[in-house]
Amino acid sequence: MTLMTKFLGAVAATALSAGAALAEPALIFDLGGKFDKSFNEAAFGGAQRWAKETGNTFREIELQSEAQREQALRRFAEAGSNPIIMTGFAFGDALGQVAGDYPDTDFVIIDMVVDAPNVRSVVFNEHEGSYLVGMMAAMASKTNTVGFIGGMDIPLIRKFACGYAQGVKAANPDATVISNMTGTTPAAWNDPVKGSELTKAQISQGADVVYA
C-alpha cells in the first residue's frame, strides 16, 4: 500500500471521529468497491481501525452505478448519519445538490472542493509527492526511459503525471517520459487489463521504471 493510500486511511479515521459524538457516521465508496486495492480500500481500512479503537460502528455502501451517488447521500442524511464521507472527486456534483438540503449534517469529500458550510473538502498536493517519485525513477532507470500510467484522464491525474515528469527531468534532463491513461470514463479506474497492456507497451519502448 502506498503512502498516499495509508494517509487516506488516516483521513477516513479522522473524519469518522469528527462526528462520532453526533450519530452513526457513514462511508460511501466510489465505483470499484471497498476492496479495490486503492483509495476505497484505504478508506475502508481507516474506518475499520476507527471502529476497533472506539468501539463504535459506521454505515457503508458500495455504489454500483453513477446514478446512485445522490441517492446514497440522501438516504444516509435522512437516516441521520453524521458525518457522511465520500471517497472520491466524482461525488462533487451530487454533494453540491444535496449538502444545502441537510444543513445539520456534516459531509466530507476527498479529492474535490465543494463550497458549502457543512462540507469538509480534503485535497492533496499530489504533484509534490509525484515529483519525488519522478526523481527516484530517473535515478533508478538504466535506460533513461521511464513511464507513467494514470487512470481516468482528468485534471487530478494529470497533476500526478505532471509532478512525476518534472521530477524525472530534475534528476535527469535527458530522460524520456512515456505517459498514458487507461481511459476517459469512470470505467478507467477498474481496467487492469488496459493497465497491463499499457505497461507492456511502455516496457517495449524502453521504460524500465513505470509509475502507475
Label the predicted regions.
Residues 1-23:
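Gram-negative bacterial Sec-dependent N-terminal signal peptides
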Residues 23-212:
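A residue-level marker of the well-folded mature domains of exported/periplasmic proteins
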